[in-house]
């Protein structure tokens, strides 16, 4: 309970003024205030003389100007040092975010910011001084209008302390009061703006509480990334439900005596006379308030229940219940207790040490009218107005323990309680023992249990009405909770996590080959690959990857057959999986016709020119590329301008003709280490005169859309340029960039610009961009845009078909959605070389770092950094000119007697000294008369005295810093600096040659300050790295002595040199920011002002290794500078998953021997597979299997709240020591709101989704990924009112049985932003087939066939029927609906469309009634011969 008490006592709030009535009809407004920096000379010279070690911080308090009342709690920033550089003006930087919310929206409510300095007195005590304050206006002059300015503002500061605001002469507006003295040249830079993302967290933060964004709030998760601001976009911990039963109170010494004394004391307190008859006041009710408290405030309104005496319950219940209560209250020594007859349920508990359950016992008293024999006066006690809290208790449950019984002591008296009200006194404890003190105030006892049905409120905050009733609560394991109470018996104890079933297979050549009936093409011979052995070695793994997910739930045969059909979790797989691109992926083999090529060339696409304004040489994408790294590095054109030109997007012939074609598209990709690119929306303009549909047809060109929505078809295409020149690349990075172009495949995701749904992905190799000495080169590609759809087949009826833990495959359909026409170019540019340090040289690849220990100090100034390293003669300089700290001390000493005003006028010591010298020169020139000579002598005397004082200060300063400076120079003499160029997951191996510089032996302890840098302790691992790098230094067995968690030790003989093997390996990457919305339109003016090729920052890392002998003395220091380099992403996986659940994936690797260029292991054995993940919160592992068995990489990752996107990398190794990754995968997990729908194939199922309006009016439209099976009402554009609630009606008619996943997006059509997104999980069962037919058709027949079938109305009345089919592309009806009288027969006309290939198809015909409910289903088997 310490954590709760600590949070509770540290967050005590002063309430607002009683006259400032809380406006209950208004909502609380959230604010974010960022205090950036202080400008100006705030600290006076007198403070500098009086205090040392000066530091500064800010304090913020809410203040009511009208009632002159401070309220809330004073918030403090972190303490910052005041010793700033000598620049003008002085600045102290804070950059701290402050958050709060309040309902007191009135201009008189302000925030007072106080500047406080703290320092040490001469006796060592801490002294706090106020240096000024400012008045920050939260609300505008108009009431209820919060300030909306988000830009930086300056807050003027005033002399004095905020206590001056309590003076009666300071009236509003206080800024214009004559008593307020403004501080010149002093201000505070800040921003203040409303912060709506804080609104879901109002239940965790009390009103008027000022909190920092860096403060840990109980109930909130830590923020993503390294910003540390948890309130900028709050993320909530998942709540759990706790149940309390058999609750009763025991009061001391007995319930009767306790209540009798309480009534008598209340009567005495109210009447002010002696004890009266207790009949004038009686107990009406005994209430219990129960609520969850997070240390800051109550999470929800308390639940109020009524307690009754134990005997009252026993008289109204059965004998068994009476025995139960009597047994539970044996410890009360026969005393009567207060019992709760109901069950308590607390769904808002969170697994956090500061969360506690608060119990408050309240008594309600009744004063009968005329109890004393007279008429009731207006001042008498009313019948229900007398309520008093008498006891309270706090329980901090351990959420990891199981159900049990708890007994808590009750508390009372003057100590603080969560309700901040007066509590009835406790008995005197002066003569009591510790055991008696625990029970003499009373006890509370109850049974508790943790519910397994999961929370009933949304994890984003358990606010009333926040979650729509259509969604079922999700359990911690991801299994939906039962919809009825009858299911609780089995659903409360799930036997397994209920994993979903999925399988994905991608072809190594073209992903479209999976859906084709033709046999797959044979992979090319690796010996004939034009890429050479170097690229073959990089292509260890490629595109054949399978996804498997095991169903660990126990089958029905093991559970027993239940009486009720239980709800089953819908197995989930993503709708769109990425095309898995590998090193062998090529552009489509289908070529455009010559007529289409002419049409493409004549469309007016801008021509790409080289540096000489000449057309760029075009190469054939099927031509081999011979990569010569030396030729690429010796190119005189050091700049590479990479051009990506998007030309056209054509619809594929294999695409379903009923699917609507998008009107606009946009693309997302990432090139090298530039930021992730999201292009503007592009209009698809249909070309006239295109050929007939075929694999090589060209249908639509891409045209940029203007900001007003118009487009000009005369300037088609989108061109993006990336400039990679020596100014962009780091030293030695040219080699990395050439390798990137040679080995990497660029993945481009194609999105619908209107619905923001993923259409598909395409992959293009960039090896043709290697210029190999040419001035420029370009290549045109026609790329297949592929989408992979998953469908769960009908599950087996019997549980015995698939045993426990078996893997069940699902149907995977790979569909070619279209073809993207793309041109890539690389234009060479001549660049100026760098002034110092040539980037032409590759980074140092030396594996041995030498340090012979013979370095020494060659003399020189200890005050000049790097002085001993200088080898040239320089002019002597004054010490104060090269040491700013010494100059500040000399200036402070000079102005010690001039007062703070003179000290604040000039702070530059060098400038002051120059003015002094000029004054002396002028005095000497004017030295003719006696007065001038006398003045000159006095000045010279003053200068000599000043110089003498300066020499004393310099001598004292030198003595103080001598030891530190000598130690620094000696440390530099034994320090070796080295730079590493590391990539994600790659182990950088090197050896440090450590020499013992002494004539005696030493045991050296090796200390490393970075977890990513380690010593290689295993001799086999050391030998492996030596052989891999070709290093021939000595290798020793058992070189280090290990002492548990302490630093390893090494024994060195006198003057001996030993090679220390070290390895640096990092799995951390910077935060990624993928987007699912198109970018703004980029005009030529914008492109000139802000180039598109600005790179993303890759921070430099540092590590230090200390070599320390037994005495603690350092004999060597190794300082490593690690420059992170971009890594190659071989495959990108994009998954869509329900929010706040676990995604469990098993990605199957292909057989090892089928991969060209794969490493060769032992005969008949596959090399081991190891995996690592960049996110420590993701569970990632690869299990070892037997020879010839498939290998699976298992992933388990928690999805966040919708619409969060989580990105991480998976690194795969094929060696035991994790030296070099053979593949790197990027995984993107999209979290969506989940809607489960159970339906029948061919039958319409209706449901409604609740839409909640934002703060403004928005014109929105609903889009779906399967418009043939899911319809919405309204179908077009409609208005979503602000803060309103509106229903979106959805109609689902699946065509086939099984489980499918449909995306539903609500998009703002004006700004093309995603307002809401759902993942509709369809669980569709097949209706009963009443009749079956079979026909035969000629394959390739262009005419088709007409057939007829009959249907008899089984009802006695006339009925209307509707016809539907699961294959509308193969079967059409003569009439979509018909009417038939009762008992009559109707003939249905069928039109079977031709098929281009031989085979057989089963077509279902659904006959529905007027309400679209299925009446009968026919099956027609069509044989194409």
UniProtKB/Swiss-Prot annotation:
Gene coding for it: Nphp4
Gene Ontology cellular component annotations, sorted alphabetically: bicellular tight junction; cell-cell junction; centriole; centrosome; ciliary basal body; ciliary base; ciliary transition zone; cytoplasm
Subunit structure comment from the entry: Interacts with NPHP1 and RPGRIP1L/NPHP8; NPHP1, NPHP4 and RPGRIP1L are proposed to form a functional NPHP1-4-8 module localized to cell-cell contacts and the ciliary transition zone; NPHP4 mediates the interaction between NPHP1 and RPGRIP1L. Interacts with IQCB1/NPHP5; the interaction likely requires additional interactors. Interacts with RPGRIP1, CEP164, JADE1, PALS1, INADL, PARD6A, INVS, DVL2. Interacts with INTU; INTU mediates the interaction between NPHP4 and DAAM1. Interacts with JADE1. Interacts with SPATA7.
Residue numbers spanned by region Sufficient for basal bodies localization: 822-1425
Function comment: Involved in the organization of apical junctions; the function is proposed to implicate a NPHP1-4-8 module. Does not seem to be strictly required for ciliogenesis. Required for building functional cilia. Involved in the organization of the subapical actin network in multiciliated epithelial cells. Seems to recruit INT to basal bodies of motile cilia which subsequently interacts with actin-modifying proteins such as DAAM1.
Recorded family membership: Belongs to the NPHP4 family.
Skewed-composition ranges (Low complexity): 473-484, 507-530
Name listed for the protein in its UniProt record: Nephrocystin-4
Subcellular location: Cytoplasm, Cytoskeleton, Cilium basal body; Cytoplasm, Cytoskeleton, Microtubule organizing center, Centrosome; Cell junction, Tight junction
Predominant localisation class: cytoplasm
Tissues where this protein is expressed: Expressed in the retina (at protein level).
Stretch list, region Disordered: 448-554
């Amino acid at each position: 309970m310490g954590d709760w008490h600590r949070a509770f006592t540290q967050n005590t709030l002063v309430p607002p003024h009683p006259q400032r009535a809380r406006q209950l009809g208004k909502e609380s407004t959230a604010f974010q205030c960022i205090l950036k920096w202080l400008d100006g000379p705030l600290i006076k010279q007198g403070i500098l003389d009086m205090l040392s070690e000066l530091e500064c911080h800010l304090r913020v308090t809410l203040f009511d100007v009208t009632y002159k009342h401070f309220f809330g709690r004073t918030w403090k920033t972190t303490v910052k040092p005041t010793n700033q550089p000598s620049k003008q003006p002085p600045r102290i930087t804070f950059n701290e975010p402050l958050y709060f919310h309040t309902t007191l929206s009135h201009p008189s409510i302000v925030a007072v910011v106080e500047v406080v300095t703290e320092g040490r007195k001469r006796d060592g005590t801490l002294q706090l001084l106020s240096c000024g304050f400012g008045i920050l206006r939260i609300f505008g002059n108009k009431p209820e209008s919060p300030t909306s300015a988000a830009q930086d503002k300056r807050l003027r500061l005033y002399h004095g302390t905020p206590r001056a605001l309590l003076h009666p002469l300071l009236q509003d507006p206080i800024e214009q009061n004559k008593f307020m003295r403004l501080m010149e040249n002093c201000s505070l830079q800040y921003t203040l703006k409303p912060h709506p993302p804080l609104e879901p967290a109002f239940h965790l933060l009390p009103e008027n509480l000022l909190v920092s964004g860096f403060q840990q709030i109980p109930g909130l998760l830590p923020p993503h990334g390294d910003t540390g601001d948890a309130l900028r976009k709050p993320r909530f911990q998942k709540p759990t439900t706790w149940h309390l039963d058999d609750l009763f109170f025991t009061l001391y010494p007995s319930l009767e005596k306790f209540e009798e004394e309480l009534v008598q004391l209340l009567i005495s307190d109210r009447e002010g006379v002696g004890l009266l008859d207790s009949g004038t006041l009686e107990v009406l009710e005994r209430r219990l308030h129960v609520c969850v408290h997070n240390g800051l405030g109550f999470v929800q309104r308390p639940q109020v229940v009524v307690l009754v005496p134990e005997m009252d319950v026993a008289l109204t219940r059965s004998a068994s219940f009476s025995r139960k209560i009597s047994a539970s209250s044996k410890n009360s020594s026969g005393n009567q207790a207060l019992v709760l007859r109901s069950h308590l349920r607390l769904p808002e508990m969170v697994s956090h040490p500061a969360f506690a359950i608060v119990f408050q016992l309240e008594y309600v008293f009744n004063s009968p009218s005329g109890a004393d024999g007279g008429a009731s006066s207006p001042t008498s006690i009313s019948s229900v107005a007398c309520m008093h809290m008498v006891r309270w208790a706090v329980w901090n449950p351990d959420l990891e323990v199981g159900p049990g019984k708890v007994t808590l002591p009750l508390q009372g008296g003057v100590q603080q309680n969560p309700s901040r009200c007066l509590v009835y006194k406790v008995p005197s404890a002066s003569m009591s023992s510790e055991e008696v003190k625990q029970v003499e105030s009373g006890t509370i006892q109850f049974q508790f249990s943790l519910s397994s049905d999961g929370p009933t409120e949304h994890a984003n905050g358990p606010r009333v009405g926040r979650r729509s009733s259509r969604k079922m609560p999700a359990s911690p394991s991801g299994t939906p909770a039962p919809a009825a109470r009858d299911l609780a018996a089995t659903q409360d104890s799930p036997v397994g996590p209920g994993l979903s079933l999925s399988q994905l297979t991608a072809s190594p050549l073209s992903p479209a080959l999976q859906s084709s009936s033709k046999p797959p093409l044979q992979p090319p011979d690796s010996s004939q690959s034009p890429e050479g052995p170097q690229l073959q070695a990089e292509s260890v793994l490629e595109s054949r990857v399978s996804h498997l997910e095991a169903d660990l739930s126990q089958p029905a045969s093991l559970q027993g057959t239940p009486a009720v059909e239980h709800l089953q979790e819908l197995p989930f797989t993503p709708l769109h999986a990425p095309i898995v691109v590998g090193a062998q992926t090529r552009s489509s083999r289908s070529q455009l016709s010559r007529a289409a090529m002419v049409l493409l060339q004549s469309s007016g696409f801008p021509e790409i020119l080289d540096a000489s304004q000449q057309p760029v040489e075009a190469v054939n994408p099927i031509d081999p590329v011979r990569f010569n790294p030396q030729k690429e590095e010796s190119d005189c054109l050091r700049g590479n301008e990479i051009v990506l030109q998007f030309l056209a997007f054509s619809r594929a012939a294999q695409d379903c003709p009923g699917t609507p074609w998008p009107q606009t598209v946009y693309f997302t990709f990432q090139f090298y280490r530039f930021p992730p690119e999201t292009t503007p929306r592009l209009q698809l303009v249909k070309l006239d005169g295109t050929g007939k549909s075929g694999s090589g047809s060209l249908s639509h060109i891409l045209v940029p859309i203007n900001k007003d929505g118009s487009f000009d078809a005369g300037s088609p295409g989108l061109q993006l340029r990336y400039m990679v020149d020596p100014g962009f690349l780091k030293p030695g990075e040219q080699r990395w960039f050439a390798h990137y172009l040679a080995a990497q495949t660029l993945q481009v995701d194609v999105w619908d610009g209107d619905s923001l749904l993923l259409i598909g992905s395409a992959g293009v190799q960039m090896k043709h961009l290697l210029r190999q000495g040419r001035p420029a080169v370009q290549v045109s590609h026609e790329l297949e845009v592929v989408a992979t759809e998953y469908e769960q087949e009908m599950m087996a009826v019997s549980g015995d078909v698939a045993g426990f833990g078996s893997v069940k495959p699902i149907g995977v359909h790979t569909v070619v959605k279209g073809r993207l026409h793309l041109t890539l170019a690389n234009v060479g540019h001549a660049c100026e070389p760098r002034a110092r340090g040539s980037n032409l040289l590759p980074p140092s690849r030396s594996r041995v770092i030498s340090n012979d220990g013979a370095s020494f100090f060659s003399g020189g100034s200890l005050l000049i950094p790097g002085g001993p390293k200088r080898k040239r003669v320089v002019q002597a300089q004054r010490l104060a000119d090269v040491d700013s700290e010494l100059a500040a001390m000399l200036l402070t000493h000079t102005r010690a007697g001039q007062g703070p005003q003179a000290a604040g006028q000039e702070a530059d010591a060098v400038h002051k000294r120059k003015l002094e010298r000029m004054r002396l020169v002028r005095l000497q020139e004017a030295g003719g008369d006696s007065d001038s000579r006398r003045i000159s002598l006095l000045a010279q005397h003053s200068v000599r005295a000043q110089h003498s004082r300066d020499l004393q200060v310099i001598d004292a300063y030198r003595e103080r810093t001598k030891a530190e400076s000598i130690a620094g120079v000696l440390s530099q003499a034994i320090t070796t600096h080295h730079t590493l160029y590391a990539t994600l997951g790659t182990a950088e191996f090197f050896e440090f040659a450590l020499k013992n510089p002494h004539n005696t032996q030493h045991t050296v302890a090796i200390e490393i300050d970075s977890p990513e840098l380690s010593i290689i302790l295993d001799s086999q691992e050391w030998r492996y790295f030596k052989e891999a790098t070709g290093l021939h230094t000595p290798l020793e067995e058992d070189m280090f002595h290990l002492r548990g968690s302490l630093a390893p030790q090494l024994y060195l003989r006198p003057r001996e040199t030993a090679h220390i093997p070290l390895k640096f390996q990092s799995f951390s990457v910077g935060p990624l920011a993928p987007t699912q919305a198109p970018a703004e339109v980029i005009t030529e003016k914008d492109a000139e002002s802000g180039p598109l090729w600005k790179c993303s920052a890759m921070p430099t890392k540092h590590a230090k290794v200390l070599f320390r002998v037994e005495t603690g003395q350092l004999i060597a220091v190794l300082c490593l500078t690690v420059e992170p380099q971009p890594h190659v992403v071989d495959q990108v996986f994009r998954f869509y998953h329900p929010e706040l659940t676990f995604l469990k994936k098993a990605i199957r690797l292909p057989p090892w021997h089928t991969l060209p260029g794969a490493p060769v292991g032992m005969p008949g054995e596959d090399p081991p597979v190891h995996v690592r993940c960049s996110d420590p919160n993701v569970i990632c592992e690869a299990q070892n299997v037997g020879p010839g068995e498939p290998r699976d990489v298992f992933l388990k990752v928690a999805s966040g709240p919708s619409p969060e996107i989580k990105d991480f990398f998976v690194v795969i190794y094929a060696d035991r020591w994790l030296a070099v990754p053979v593949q790197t995968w990027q995984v993107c997990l999209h979290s969506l709101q989940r809607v489960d729908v159970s339906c029948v194939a061919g039958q319409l199922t209706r449901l409604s989704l609740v839409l909640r309006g934002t703060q403004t009016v928005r014109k929105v439209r609903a889009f779906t990924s399967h418009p043939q099976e899911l319809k919405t009402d309204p179908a077009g554009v409609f208005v979503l009112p602000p803060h309103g609630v509106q229903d979106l009606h959805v109609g689902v008619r699946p065509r086939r049985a099984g489980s499918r996943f449909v995306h539903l997006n609500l998009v703002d059509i004006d700004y093309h932003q995603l307002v809401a997104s759902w993942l509709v999980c369809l669980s569709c069962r097949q209706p009963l087939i009443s009749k079956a037919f079979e026909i035969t058709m000629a394959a390739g027949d262009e005419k088709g066939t007409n057939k007829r079938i009959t249907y008899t109305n089984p009802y006695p009345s006339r009925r209307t029927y509707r016809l539907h089919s699961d294959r509308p592309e193969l079967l059409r009806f003569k009439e979509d609906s018909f009417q038939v009288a009762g008992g009559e027969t109707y003939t249905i006309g069928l039109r079977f469309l031709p098929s281009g290939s031989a085979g057989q198809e089963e077509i279902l015909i659904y006959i529905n009634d007027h309400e679209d409910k299925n009446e009968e289903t026919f099956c027609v088997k069509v044989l194409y011969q």
